[in-house]
Amino acid sequence: MHTRRVLGLLICSIILLPITAPTVVAEWDDDNWLRNIIGPERLELGDEFGCHGFEGVDVREELWVIEECRDYLNRFTDASRCGSQPISFGHPNGPVTENVANTISEAGFSIIGDRIEGDTYGLHAVQRLTSLEKGQANISALEDAEQDSLVSIYWIARWYDVNIREDKGAISLLRSQDVWFTTWGEWHGHKESGESFENILINDSNMKTFRISTSEQTSWEVPGTAFFEWSEAPLNIQFDGQDAPIIPSDQKHLLTGIRPVEGGAFVTVAPGVSVDFIFESENVSVTHTPQSTFNGLHHSVSVVGHHVTNLHDWTSDFHNSPLRFTWLIERPASLEVDWRLPVFAVAVLIATPIAIKWVIARDQEDNEQWWN
């Protein structure tokens, strides 16, 4: 009986060891989907790549991950079609300390989110409105979004070992709305560009020329939109001497061109490009109003992928979606199993048949003694 108890304990140890053995973070892994197939596809569609740090590391305690995450991302992809350097950073929920904010800014980031409290020390803060997780989406909040606002929607594909499903009802609602699908960086850059139109003086009284002035404070070049009005409709509108393309009224992704409407036109142009309004009469009055939202749409929407350690998993449900994403990339941890586990496994592998043989021999000996 005693020997059977020993054997039982040995078998229990074999079962429990994989569960109780600790794991040790030895190195950091790479997500090669950032540069292979998926990353380039998402970049071409207009998505943005930002940073979230390193998996399992609190950026508020380990400031080194801010710059290291930027460098990790730069090894694999550009941040956007509008600029190579990442400018969006995912900060843990709650207040931001001045030290953390300064480190984020010095690393080249200018936007943080998305549940920030208090002062951001010069960084642009984006606040989360709701989640895209199935059963968690606030449909009323999506329906009641303010005009010209940026609606930021949280998305995570996996929580530990649990796969998260998207809310298809929320996605259907977004597709039906009069909204611009964009990203954090694109939205802020577009807004700043729209506020930077300047009237360029020329020696032609039948023409008015405007241009977005480029800023030295940003590493991105994002087109901006303004609504132009005039006392007389122009004969033609040109970009750098070429007829400006027409943007359809239902266009929900950023393009350059014009969208004529009654009384004026929405003009979206890249920084540095001249916009020429050609009139039949001389000295026509032209005014412009900056637009936060592209193409005269009601408001803007960006879905934000948080803690993205595997781009394949995070994008798998959105291959043909019109939604645009801000992917906050997190360098994944590479887990190394405790060295004691394989050593113990080998020992058990050797000891188990010996123990079984010994138990059988002991039982046979006991049986012989009983019959005698």
Where are the model-predicted features located?
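N-terminal membrane-targeting/anchoring modules of bacterial envelope and secretion proteins
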Residues: 79, 106-107, 169-171, 275, ...
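Extracellular beta-rich ligand/substrate-recognition surface
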Residues: 131-132, 217
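C-terminal domain-boundary segment and adjacent tail
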Residues: 36-37, 111-112, 157-251
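C-terminal beta-sandwich/jelly-roll accessory domains of carbohydrate-active enzymes
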Residues: 208-360
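Metal-dependent polysaccharide deacetylase catalytic core of the NodB/CE4 family, i.e.
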Residues: 24-130, 148-153
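A short, acidic, amphipathic alpha-helical segment used as a generic capping/interface helix at domain edges
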Residues: 134-144
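Boundary/entry segment of secreted carbohydrate-active catalytic domains
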Residues: 22-41, 45-57, 218, 298-315, ...
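Secretory targeting signatures
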Residues: 1-27, 338-372
